[in-house]
């Protein structure tokens, strides 16, 4: 723990980068035991990015715990944040073996990593996929996404909310051109998320025929920003969706997901889903984080006591 109780080291990273200026920015706050949820949200608002707190784990089988924050709430899971934290801790010599077990609000997750030259590649395992039975129709979705007609949404694939850790509404579009032109009504989009119990919309389209490469955009529910440049949780849900409704083949299905291009932050994620006997049994996302800088950060004020460890029920869906 740092000598000054109000100072923490923050390591700034970018994750899933696919070119200059790409990836999802992710600050990692070290030695974050004792920070309360409000401080986590304030730090995320300060950095305007999902912010990760590294904390001690309660479970003996976990090496450490992670808490994930956006400006308006704490999240149950953040894949790119997990990749960032593992990369930072590995660079500090605090992770020496793979896999590593990490405690989160959702429970323990397993993360594998491998070293290539000076960088590590990280794979975050997620959970079996759950497909919602209650979903909006094409007209509802077209309206909140700013589409002038529902026919721009594919009719041969369903609109369905999928969770491999957090619910994301998967929306199949006819083309990348349609995807790039989306202009959502965000208040209406968030209200739709409320009605159907999902945490964001993830519209996607195939980049080219015959290849498992897709472009996607993520519009989260009341996160404190309108769009996300690279979303591991959503990409994992999309992989499960594609394996279930498009590929329809047993075994591991692998997909490349391109995201962030309309934001000027090109990103590339590799998401996989294990299909077996008509269900998606396992899912995972692979990517890299680049360490950009580190700073000593003054913590926001804290006038209330709350444990800084992951606690069930602490997150908002």
Q: Where do the PLM segments sit?
A:
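Active-site proximal loop and beta-alpha junction motif in alpha/beta enzyme cores
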Residues: 1-77, 83-317
């Amino acid at each position: 723990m740092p000598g000054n109780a109000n100072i923490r080291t923050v390591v700034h990273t970018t994750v899933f980068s696919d070119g200059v200026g790409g990836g999802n920015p992710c600050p990692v706050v070290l030695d974050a035991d004792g920070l309360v949820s409000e401080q986590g949200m304030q730090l995320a608002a300060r950095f305007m990015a999902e912010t990760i707190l590294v904390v001690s784990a309660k479970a003996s089988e976990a090496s450490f715990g992670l808490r994930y924050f956006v400006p308006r709430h704490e999240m149950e899971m953040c894949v790119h944040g997990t990749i960032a934290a593992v990369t930072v801790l590995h660079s500090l010599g605090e992770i020496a073996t793979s896999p590593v077990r990490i405690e989160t609000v959702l429970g323990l997750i397993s993360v594998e990593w491998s070293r290539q030259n000076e960088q590590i590649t990280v794979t975050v395992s997620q959970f079996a996929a759950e497909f919602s039975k209650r979903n909006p129709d094409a007209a509802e979705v077209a309206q909140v996404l700013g589409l002038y007609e529902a026919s721009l949404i594919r009719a041969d694939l369903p609109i369905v909310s999928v969770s491999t850790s957090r619910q994301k509404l998967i929306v199949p579009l006819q083309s990348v051109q349609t995807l790039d032109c989306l202009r959502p009504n965000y208040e209406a989009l968030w209200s739709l998320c409320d009605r159907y119990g999902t945490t964001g919309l993830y519209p996607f389209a195939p980049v080219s025929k015959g290849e498992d490469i897709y472009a996607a955009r993520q519009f989260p529910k009341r996160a404190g920003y309108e769009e996300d440049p690279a979303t591991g949780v959503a990409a994992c849900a999309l992989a499960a969706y594609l394996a279930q409704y498009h590929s329809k083949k047993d075994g591991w299905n692998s997909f490349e997901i391109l995201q962030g291009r309309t934001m000027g932050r090109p990103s590339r994620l590799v998401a996989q889903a294990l299909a077996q006997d008509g269900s998606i049994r396992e899912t995972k996302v692979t990517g890299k984080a680049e360490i950009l800088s580190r700073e000593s950060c003054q913590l926001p004020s804290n006038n209330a006591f709350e444990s800084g460890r992951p606690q069930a029920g602490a997150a908002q869906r």
